[in-house]
Amino acid sequence: MKNDEVKKSIIKATIEIIEKSDGDINKITARKIADKSGVALGLINYHFGSKENLIAECSREIINEKLFGLAPDKVDYMADDGLSDLERLISFARQTFDYIYSNPSIAKISIISDFKDYDPAGNSSLTQKGFQMALRGDISERKKKLIAFSLASIMQTAFLAGDNSELIIGYSLKSKEQRDIFISDVVTMLMNAITPVA
């Protein structure tokens, strides 16, 4: 196999293992990846530096393919949609949270991977940039970044609370209805804190 074919084989095998891991990174071993991809164990480190780097790259690829493929509502995000910044951000955040809860294994791995090595090209940063696109009103870039960072961080931490979400934050996030209320409450709280209503 050529180098590109080897890398593709390793990535494909890793993605399949990630999707069956229930979000438990300990179930994803370099040996399993090597066996499933049919390559020597040393090639994983050769091509990716470490299993962790490989998992981070695969989680980015999965998220980019799935989440950004279902991007909110339209192709031209800057076109007038008749929504306020609050309504638009709630819509973007709800779609993102629905994706996270529909793909818990990859979401958990992606979030934890980003927390370990926060990268401007990582999924968390890209999600924040998407949230910033929802904010078109008279808000400084700095405040847009703060709102987007805060929202993404709150959503990720709430997701990681798992079955304890109701006990910890008062919302049962496995329920779509409760998730929607949670997002609406969080976005409203952030927007009012950053851009107080006169």
Cite the ranges covered by each PLM segment.
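Amphipathic alpha-helical linker/stalk segments
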Residues: 58-88, 125, 132
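Amphipathic alpha-helical segments used for helix-helix packing
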Residues: 94-121, 162-167
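Amphipathic alpha-helical interaction segments
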Residues: 9, 53, 91, 109, ...
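Hydrophobic alpha-helical connector segments
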Residues: 71-106, 141-148
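C-terminal peripheral helix-coil segments that are non-catalytic and often amphipathic
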Residues: 131-141, 154-198
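Generic hydrophobic, amphipathic alpha-helix propensity
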Residues: 6-15, 33, 58-62, 66
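Helix-turn-helix
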Residues: 9, 20-53, 57
